[in-house]
Amino acid sequence: GYPKLEAEYRLYDPETGITGDFDGIVASDWPTAYAAWRYERDVPRLYWVQDFEPFFFPAGPDYVVAENSYRLGYQGIACGPWLAGKVTEAGGMPCAFYDYQVDSSRYTRTNDSHRDEIFFYARPTTARRGTEFGLLVLEEVHRRRPELVINIAGWDMSQAGLNFPFVNH
């Protein structure tokens, strides 16, 4: 990746905070945004935003704290234009973005023909994924279109007792 990069790596200690003489700080999620905000020197602060983190939580304190991290005065760098706009709208943080990346030598679309299949990413342990609602929808899809192959990945659903046939990936 970065053969000429020379950087120091330190584990963060909340008791001492960020110490040292740095030219800038990059936060990469909401807890690191607050840690970097506590740094006493006046240096540029960037916030590398990879997800809209408030959506990781139901409405409540964690949602608010995550959303407020976009109001700390950073310059944001986001993965894609939607996320950059969402962060600016939610917290007022100016946010540049970079385009999504893919290694097309490894990941390609190999089947462009019509298929009677549907794919669902199920992760029941992660509330924001809405697995319960998705499974209810798939049950109705199967009732209306029993010829569709339903593919489920993300979690082993083989023992979930679902009321429709599916391919467990």
Regions inferred by a protein language model and the residue ranges of each:
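Nucleotide-activated donor-binding/catalytic signature segment of Leloir-type glycosyltransferases, i.e.
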Residues: 154-169
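Membrane-proximal helix-turn-helix segments that form the acceptor-binding/catalytic region
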Residues: 13-21, 55, 59-77
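Donor nucleotide-sugar binding/catalytic pocket of nucleotide-sugar-dependent glycosyltransferases
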Residues: 70-108
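N-terminal pre-catalytic "stem/leader" segment of glycosyltransferase-like enzymes
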Residues: 1-21, 146-149
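Conserved donor-binding/catalytic core segment of Leloir-type glycosyltransferases
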Residues: 76-77, 111-129, 135-142
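Active-site proximal beta-strand in glycosyltransferases
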Residues: 24-27, 39-56, 77
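Alpha-helix capping/helix-boundary segments
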Residues: 31-32, 53, 82-84, 157-158
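Acidic anion/phosphate-binding donor-loop and adjacent secondary structure
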Residues: 54-60, 96-116, 161-162
